[in-house]
């Protein structure tokens, strides 16, 4: 998230583990390590993941995969529900251009995921391994190759999803992209599917991006999630990072229970459920499908009671 600045900051391990144990006792179901930076850069990430799992919390990662080396994978796979690698290209050259990194990192990622898949099979672990790719004009032709590589190295799936942009983002390169012309790509990618490998082409999300229309009028999803940034701040929404009214508190300064049950959290959720203008939110946000479902529950349409 470029608008937050790429700051070399890390959550304190002891504090984070304490908060994870609190979250487990409170009934938090899952945690995904991802966000403004690369989660595997944290030197204690294996211990943190193990702590979350032992607290009864399901663990997942979204990562670029460059640091998912064999020794780290051996610790993570046994306590993790799924690991998803963000890879927006099918060749080293396009990977280097799109990710703004060395071309060698592409093969490093592929090797790391292959080792992880082999480890999973050898140890009979249950961790799901997959790739996700943002569909861009620059990577369209390389996606069949990416699907093939992912399948052959032992991944379970490849997700192809639309570009989305937080309104605060400093970059606007793809704001005018339209996905209607890429619909036939789904059929090409389906050729790579097998019994144990799926290509998930997010047609619905692409249509919603093209139409820029929302099927709900308020945000009802906030009681079901929070985002904790690397500065330990607890936020209600990606769209409003940096806005004080959406900052519930800081886990360095208060327990998660005190923050979650605090007045700032309650008042913000009430505002979002009753007043917020979702037309100012970004299309295909993480909470979009949850909001569509919850809005329909609150505002049923004709014949919804029939199976």
PLM region descriptions:
Residues 213, 240-288:
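Membrane-interface junctions of multi-pass transporters
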Residues 16, 20, 31-32:
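Active-site-adjacent substrate/metal-binding segments within catalytic domains
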